[in-house]
């Protein structure tokens, strides 16, 4: 992997703690950072984002090698971590700061995301429409250090939250098998 060959992908899918591991464990992924994007304030804090006044959503930004793990595959992984029919948050996490969004960094990513969303909608997998927003990537602000790699640092808390939030059951019911 050379720095020149790396690209960025940014996804919001509810609590960012739950979004890191599915990407971090894939080949060709250099790093996954938890943070905030899509709002109107500069350098927001977790507390500010949770207040609902910043316009930001919790998100992850992935640095990846598209020759090893193409953007299309990242989008597939993304869908399988979310409830794409719920625009008002994800699982127990409600509100604008947990809204699902695919943030595209270029026109190719936009086209891939839009086609993937249309295909998922047409597939009939869900009875409700696919409402995940597709939006142009804006400034991404890394979250506080204690949020980074949460699944590694706080394994028991992370695993418990996956279950308690309803995310694990939803993924099992809608995406497995």
From Swiss-Prot:
Catalysed reactions, semicolon-separated: L-methionyl-[protein] + [thioredoxin]-disulfide + H2O = L-methionyl-(S)-S-oxide-[protein] + [thioredoxin]-dithiol; [thioredoxin]-disulfide + L-methionine + H2O = L-methionine (S)-S-oxide + [thioredoxin]-dithiol
UniProt record, GO biological process: protein modification process
A GO term, aspect molecular function: peptide-methionine (S)-S-oxide reductase activity
Identification of the protein by name: Peptide methionine sulfoxide reductase MsrA
KW Transmembrane helix (keyword) present: no
HAMAP family on file: MsrA
Keyword presence, Ribosomal protein: no
Keywords from the UniProt entry: Oxidoreductase
Matching Pfam families: PMSR (PF01625)
InterPro entries to which the protein is assigned, alphabetical: Met_Sox_Rdtase_MsrA_dom (IPR002569), Met_Sox_Rdtase_MsrA_sf (IPR036509)
Family of the protein in this entry: Belongs to the MsrA Met sulfoxide reductase family.
Active site: 15
Organism: Listeria monocytogenes serotype 4b (strain CLIP80459)
EC number(s) on file: 1.8.4.11
Function: Has an important function as a repair enzyme for proteins that have been inactivated by oxidation. Catalyzes the reversible oxidation-reduction of methionine sulfoxide in proteins to methionine.
């Amino acid at each position: 992997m050379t720095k020149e060959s790396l690209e960025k992908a940014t996804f919001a899918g509810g609590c960012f703690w739950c979004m890191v591991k599915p990407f971090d464990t894939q080949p060709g992924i250099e790093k996954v950072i938890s943070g905030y994007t899509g709002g109107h304030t500069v350098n927001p804090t977790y507390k500010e984002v949770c207040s609902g006044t910043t316009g930001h959503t919790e998100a992850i930004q992935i640095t990846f090698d598209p020759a090893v793990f193409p953007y299309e595959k990242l989008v597939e992984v993304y869908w399988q971590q979310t409830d794409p029919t719920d625009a008002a948050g994800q699982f127990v996490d409600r509100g604008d700061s947990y809204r699902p969004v695919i943030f595209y960094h270029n026109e190719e990513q936009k086209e891939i995301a839009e086609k993937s969303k249309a295909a998922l909608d047409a597939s009939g997998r869900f009875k409700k429409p696919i409402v995940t927003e597709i939006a142009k990537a804006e400034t991404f602000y890394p979250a506080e250090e204690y949020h980074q790699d949460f699944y590694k640092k706080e394994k028991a808390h992370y695993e418990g939250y996956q279950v308690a939030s309803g995310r694990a059951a939803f993924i099992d019911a809608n995406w497995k098998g």
